Amino acid sequence: SPNDYFGGDLRGIEEKLDYLQEMGISCLYLNPIFEADSNHRYNTADYRRIDPMLGTEEDFIRLCAQARQRGIRILLDGVFSHTGSDSRYFDKKGTYGNGACDSPSSPYYPWYRFGRYPEEYESWWGFATLPNVEETEQSYGAFIHGEGGVLQHWLEAGASGWRLDVADELPDCFIRDVRRRIKAQSPDNVLLGEVWEDCSDKQGPQGRRGYVNGDELDSAMDYPLRRAILDFCAGKLDAFDAAEAMW
């Protein structure tokens, strides 16, 4: 259930850093940590606020600093293809005021694609709690990857990179802009992408996606490799078929 919570916070991670260092861990990838009304937090309510259940921005800054001292870098999860419906940007429940559902004059209104306003709108895979955003909208781009935007804010707070949620649903131009911002902060910062198929041969409406062209992702979540390894370990694939699946 998206409403079941099992504890754990940023300070808890900090308390385990010595243990993680002993294990040889060099990077921690955190699932979404920003304010949201679910436990998975892929329905972002506020990109600039740590979910209070996890801690504060000060906790995050300290975690990143302590991790870096131990040779561990922190990677954040960037959910930028959609927001939460209960967010300061969409505000379907009227929680925040001045969201896209509150008025067409809201600064966030151009971010979304409405049909019959405000009841009908495009959403991620039909989930009404996840309204899609228009990534090529100038004001949205400025908010995410512009000067002083979301990416820069959390990189300056200590993050060492981002993992893009559903990268295969983000325009190539948006990914390139995200990369430019991340690398402008430090060439060592990392940009990963969630791509469910072979990222080197992923096809989109305009043909092959440019993930591996050198100006988008540094790497991707290798789900085909994961599946091949799991199936081999479970006895569902022999060594030959596993090798074929990996290639």
What are these regions (language model features)?
Residues 39, 47, 52, 85, ...:
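Short capping/connector residues at structural and topological boundaries
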Residues 1-11, 43-57, 127-143, 159-169, ...:
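The substrate-binding groove and active-site-proximal loops of carbohydrate-active enzymes
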Residues 64-70, 82, 87-98, 150, ...:
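Active-site-proximal helices and loops of the catalytic beta/alpha 8
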